[in-house]
Amino acid sequence: MNTILAQQIASEGGVEAWMIAQQHKSLLRFLTCGSVDDGKSTLIGRLLHDTLQIYEDQLSSLHNDSKRHGTQGEKLDLALLVDGLQAEREQGITIDVAYRYFSTEKRKFIIADTPGHEQYTRNMATGASTCDLAILLIDARKGVLDQTRRHSFISTLLGIKHLVVAINKMDLVDYREETFARIREDYLTFAEQLPGDLDIRFVPLSALEGDNVAAQSANMRWYSGPTLLEVLETVDIQRAVDRQPMRFPVQYVNRPNPDFRGYAGTLASGSVKVGERIKVLPSGVESSVARIVTFDGDKEEVCAGEAITLVLNDDIDISRGDLLLAANETLAPARHAAIDVVWMAEQPLAPGQSYDVKLAGKKTRARIEAICYQIDINNLTQRDVESLPLNGIGLVEMTFDEPLALDIYQQNPVTGGLIFIDRLSNVTVGAGMVRELDERGATPPVEYSAFELELNALVRRHFPHWDARDLLGDKHGAA
């Protein structure tokens, strides 16, 4: 067992008291990104090592692994704490997204270590999609590179507002202040083109030697700012979803017995309380909240991010993929939208193609109408293209098969973010972020044949646990 952890548990008065204290700490999700060999995995290993998060058996194993796979000579290769795949260790690179967890007295952390190679940009986008902060590593010898720009743009595109530019390997440039100042100026010049109001901070460090990671460096007395760990512990994360209206995508209809019917999911934004009037989209039917069931029992009110089951006062037709919002809110369903896309498939994205798309719990089909432009990562300019290649980032116009309740991604990532799924292979081939909604062309009501209506009624009557929707949109429930 970790000796420091044992001391912390003892100081809190036992395991139960320690666990309660952990629950009340704030959580920060962050990722490390940047160009290949900039030291991302080594930095995470250093954070884990210097915050005493490594168990004795892990440390012993690390000594042995460093001798077999290490790239640092006689020193501990801290990157091996994170690079777990055999191919990663053999090549000395990160391929998959690796997640690590640690905590200090002030905060809990979830780290996503993302790959630096261009061909794994899609893995990096996956890691960034759930993070609040990005650490962008820059090799002090190389300065700002294409992958640095690419990862910076993807991070901001995915809604990350806090960027920490960690200028690493300062030991290899003799800890020179002018090197740090030059790279800082270069990055700030580039960052003027990034979207959004960003909080950008700079820390000169050496992940290998531990300078300015968890402790102040004696080699860079010219730097008087906080260490990287101090930045992570004190940064104030303001989540946009906390200030947005209530959105609750239904993930699952929970019906363990005939006397209970609840709608499970994670509250995407805002808050909801018992007695509040809510509206269901797309049907528009209204009801009120009777109970809010959580893992810790019933609650009177919950906020964004909590996993809950809502029980309503009325037995109405609600299925997976429906969206619950406050009754006084208006959210017009849209069939057309402009979507920022990070493309992840070998086959390019081109106009005329159709894909399954998944938005929260909702799955439908969409058609690519046009590729507006592709972003040139080198200078963030827009260029006309006929298709979007693997790892390409651009803006596309799409039409959905049915009207969808969507939000702008920067306002609500859950109800404004979607993934593209290949209809034949069922493989995720792209990620999309809603930029603009186009409510043109009101969709005429769908006309169903007599056979379709009879079959729908039969299914709802004899198989109520399937939660089939009434095609005519009646307000009575399926049960």
From Swiss-Prot:
Its EC number is 2.7.7.4. Residues 168-171 are annotated as: G4. The lineage of its organism: Bacteria, Pseudomonadati, Pseudomonadota, Gammaproteobacteria, Enterobacterales. Residues 206-208 are annotated as: G5. This is Sulfate adenylyltransferase subunit 1. Keywords: ATP-binding, GTP-binding, Nucleotide-binding, Nucleotidyltransferase, Transferase. One of its GO terms (molecular function) is ATP binding. With CysD forms the ATP sulfurylase (ATPS) that catalyzes the adenylation of sulfate producing adenosine 5'-phosphosulfate (APS) and diphosphate, the first enzymatic step in sulfur assimilation pathway. APS synthesis involves the formation of a high-energy phosphoric-sulfuric acid anhydride bond driven by GTP hydrolysis by CysN coupled to ATP hydrolysis by CysD. Residues 92-96 are annotated as: G2. Residues 34-41 are annotated as: G1. The gene is cysN. Heterodimer composed of CysD, the smaller subunit, and CysN.
